[in-house]
């Protein structure tokens, strides 16, 4: 594919030890050679080497920066094009000057995600792998990054390609039946083959969809909201789970005036922990904003940790709060077990019914293990499955797999009902196309542009 040469800063903007300007395209080495004082990059430098030198402004002859230049020649690069990476000091001013020089001498500013888009367009990766690159960058837990890396390595792609190949084999057999309708035994054999293979494809699609709920949690984290009256120990619970001091812990009710959020691994389950301001009536303007944000967080939660105070009897406020959350996935926690017990546990059990109940002391770090195990068991039914298995974690992929399951079922129903093979062929072809959208082989240009526009600059 004949494309122009693009350039961008590939490291976060701001002060740092290193900043990188990346170029990709047919003129990448030539443009860098015009700016670089050192070895002759075009002729004297082999591929996949790092070279010390300086960036010079060709017009003023001024030394702009002391650099290390990586030369990566096509096709063994991320984009399958020539790539230059100019490693500069991390100051904003200097790295921008180097970027401007690359554009002055022939490169174009890259669009968001354009380097990865070129890797896709040049056949280096497919669309699902490209999406996994961004998932990997955005991953907040070890497990999320592992799921993304498995997808980058092509595990999902291989499974999708295998099913598409099976559909092509069915379609080839259907074509034989259409071309030679006079042979009854051919039609019978075709129907039998079609049903057997189609049911296997549907079974594989179902297996992938079965991983969707867990995969989405791995990718995005389980949105977990800690809720309860002010000063029941919500912030202490957040700090114990993340083993950090993120929230202010005091004896003053209403100290948390905003929604605090943190990512953490709990028994291999990635949680997006949200500590809310206590939900109560208040005249304090700042606290009132926090309460409203808490209500919004509750409405979006996957899991709610409802905290009660062992040192206080249940109040109407506790009952009111539980009414708000009782129809969600809830774990009730009676905290501050190190203090005198003034709460009636039997009354708590009457209020919550079969909802899981854990007793803890965040001060003495007691009951935390039981809480973590309960969280894991509630969503994963025990041990989390092997992280090396292939998960479907992307909402777009899940939606397409559901569509493919329906169209392959339509083909099965049609074949079993004796519908003419050329009609069955339509459903099979549609299934093949839908699966192709996952890996980008049948995706529209508009979809591809939209997906890559979500990437960051320089990637």
UniProtKB/Swiss-Prot annotation:
Chain positions recorded as Mg(2+) binding sites: 235, 256
Cofactor(s) for this UniProt protein: K(+)
GO cellular component term, pick one: cytosol
Residues binding GTP: 231-236, 250-256, 275-278
InterPro entries reported for this sequence: G_TrmE, GTP-bd, GTP-bd_TrmE_N, GTPase_MnmE, MnmE_dom2, MnmE_helical, P-loop_NTPase, Small_GTP-bd
Family: Belongs to the TRAFAC class TrmE-Era-EngA-EngB-Septin-like GTPase superfamily. TrmE GTPase family.
Protein name: tRNA modification GTPase MnmE
Keywords noted in UniProt: Cytoplasm, GTP-binding, Hydrolase, Magnesium, Metal-binding, Nucleotide-binding, Potassium, tRNA processing
Signal peptide: none
Enzymatic class: hydrolase
All copies of domain TrmE-type G, residue ranges: 221-380
């Amino acid at each position: 594919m004949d494309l122009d040469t693009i350039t961008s800063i590939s490291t976060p903007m701001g002060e740092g030890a290193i900043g990188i300007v990346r170029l990709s395209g047919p003129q990448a080495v030539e443009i860098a050679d015009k700016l670089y004082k050192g070895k002759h990059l075009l002729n004297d430098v082999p591929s996949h080497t790092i070279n010390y030198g300086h960036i010079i402004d060709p017009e003023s002859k001024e030394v702009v920066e002391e650099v290390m230049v990586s030369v990566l020649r096509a096709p063994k690069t991320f984009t399958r094009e020539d790539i230059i990476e100019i490693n500069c000091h991390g100051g904003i001013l200097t790295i921008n000057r180097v970027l401007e020089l690359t554009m002055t001498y022939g490169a174009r500013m890259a669009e968001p995600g354009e380097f990865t888009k070129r890797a896709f367009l040049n056949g280096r990766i497919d669309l699902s792998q490209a999406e996994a690159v961004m998932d990997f960058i955005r991953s907040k837990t070890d497990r999320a990054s592992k799921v993304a890396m498995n997808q980058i390595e092509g595990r999902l792609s291989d499974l999708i390609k295998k099913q598409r190949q099976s559909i092509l084999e069915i379609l080839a057999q259907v074509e034989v039946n259409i071309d030679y309708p006079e042979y009854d035994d051919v039609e019978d054999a075709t129907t039998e083959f079609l049903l057997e293979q189609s049911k296997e494809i549907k079974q594989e699609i179902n297996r992938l969809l079965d991983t969707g709920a867990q995969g989405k949690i791995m990718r995005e984290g389980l949105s977990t909201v800690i809720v309860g009256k002010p000063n029941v120990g919500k912030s202490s619970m957040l700090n114990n789970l993340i083993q950090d001091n993120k929230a202010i812990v005091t004896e003053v009710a209403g100290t948390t005036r905003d929604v605090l959020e943190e990512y953490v691994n709990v028994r291999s389950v990635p949680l997006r922990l949200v500590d809310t301001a206590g939900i109560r009536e208040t005249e304090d303007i700042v606290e009132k904003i926090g309460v409203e944000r808490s209500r919004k967080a509750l409405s979006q939660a996957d899991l709610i940790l409802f905290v009660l105070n062992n040192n206080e009897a249940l109040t109407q406020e506790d009952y009111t709060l539980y009414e708000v959350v009782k129809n969600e996935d809830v774990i009730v926690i009676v905290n501050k077990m190190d203090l005198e017990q003034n709460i009636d546990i039997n009354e708590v059990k009457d209020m919550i019914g079969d909802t899981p109940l854990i007793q803890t002391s965040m001060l003495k770090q007691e009951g935390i293990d039981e809480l973590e195990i309960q969280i894991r068991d509630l969503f994963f039914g025990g041990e989390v499955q092997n992280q090396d298995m292939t998960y479907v974690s992307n909402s777009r992929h899940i939606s397409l797999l559901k569509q493919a399951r329906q169209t392959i079922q339509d083909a099965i129903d049609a074949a079993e009902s004796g519908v003419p093979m050329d009609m069955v062929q339509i459903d099979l072809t549609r299934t093949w196309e839908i699966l192709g959208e996952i890996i980008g082989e049948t995706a529209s240009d508009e979809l591809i542009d939209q997906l890559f526009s979500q990437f960051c600059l320089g990637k």
